[in-house]
């Protein structure tokens, strides 16, 4: 079986009037170099390179960007002047979340692993602060960066990071749960410190829910255009980690789970021409 995943590419043969040779597309084609698809497959869509490069349509204007956009605006419900904290802030989703929060008038505090990633988040992405979760005084530094508490916590990590943020949540806080990567390799997932279990232990329990971006599939074009516009305006920046050759994909996937990537992890399987 083909491992699932999104890809972008160019149509090289078509019998459809909806897709012609040379069209640039994104599709849920998995880890493979070629795909035969039906034109009416909802997972196949044309991409406008004015909104970003082919690779960007797998990142900041693709699924990760749309995840950030809808997770923050629809689940997080941001209001100007609030404080947002986002874990994995240098990654594809987290970096977009914080920048969108800044566009919306919020204070954005990122959490990332290591000085280099934190420097990138603060200096290049213009977050108000970024805290290194590997630091010995992580919890104290996070509290100092959020003097007015936390109104929105965009969850990507789980575990000890979530425990530290949970202590700072204000009444009425919202927690969009995108993922919890620190728990994925737990042998006993039923008893691991997932964000849902941690948040349920608070009194009162903050508003929270796990979401998937396909909930807003009918609005994907809206999100892509808005994200593309912010890129063109210079308000939304991104970074990519691109490996070469499909055979190397497992190595880079394992590295991503360990936080070795910087930005969206991609694999280039062929040249566009």
Stretches found by the model and what they are:
Residues 233-242, 250-273:
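C-terminal capping/lid region of NAD(P)-dependent oxidoreductase domains
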Residues 20, 51-54, 77-83, 147-150:
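Short helix-loop-beta connector
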Residues 1-31:
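Glycine-rich beta-strand-centered segment in the early N-terminal region that forms part
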Residues 28-43, 219:
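A structural motif shared across PLP-dependent enzymes of the aminotransferase-like
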Residues 58-136:
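Mid-domain Rossmann-like dinucleotide-binding core that forms the NAD(H)/NADP(H) cofactor-binding site
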Residues 104, 160-236, 269-273:
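Glycine-rich phosphate-binding loop and adjacent beta-alpha segment
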Residues 18-19, 78, 169, 191:
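Short, well-ordered loop/turn sites that connect or cap secondary structure elements
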Residues 137-148:
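Short amphipathic alpha-helix with an adjacent loop that forms part of the alpha/beta core around
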